[in-house]
Amino acid sequence: MKVQILFALMMVLVTLCLGQKMQRGVIEDVCNNCETNCQLIKDYYGRSFCQDSLCQDSYRFCTNLEFTMDKCKDENSNTHAGCVTALLSTS
């Protein structure tokens, strides 16, 4: 239940933020919570995944968003929504 609420909160936050310039730290905070709640473990090959399978989609979403935001940062560590939207839609 806690995971579902967290995922819903993330989706609302991202939806609200995609229409404007975002601060990277806000999304990082949300995704750090996501990663913590997933109870990450590594498989034999060193790949990370969530021990709780219900959390795996949230973890993938956060991982993809953080990767996308790294590619879209400007000199002030701000991320532009258009770049995030474009890269998320192609991944």
UniProtKB/Swiss-Prot annotation:
Residue stretch(es) of the prosequence: 22-24
Subcellular location: Secreted
Signal peptide location: 1-21
Chief place of localization: secreted
Gene Ontology MF annotations: toxin activity
Alphabetical UniProt keywords: Disulfide bond, Secreted, Signal, Toxin
Distribution of this protein across tissues and organs: Expressed by the venom duct.
Maturation and modification: Contains 4 disulfide bonds.
One cellular component (GO) term of this entry: extracellular region
Bilayer-crossing regions: none
Domain comment, as recorded: The cysteine framework is XXII (C-C-C-C-C-C-C-C).
Family: Belongs to the teretoxin C (TC) superfamily.
Protein name, as recorded: Teretoxin Tan22.13
The organism of origin for this protein: Terebra anilis
Upper classification of the organism: Eukaryota, Metazoa, Spiralia, Lophotrochozoa, Mollusca
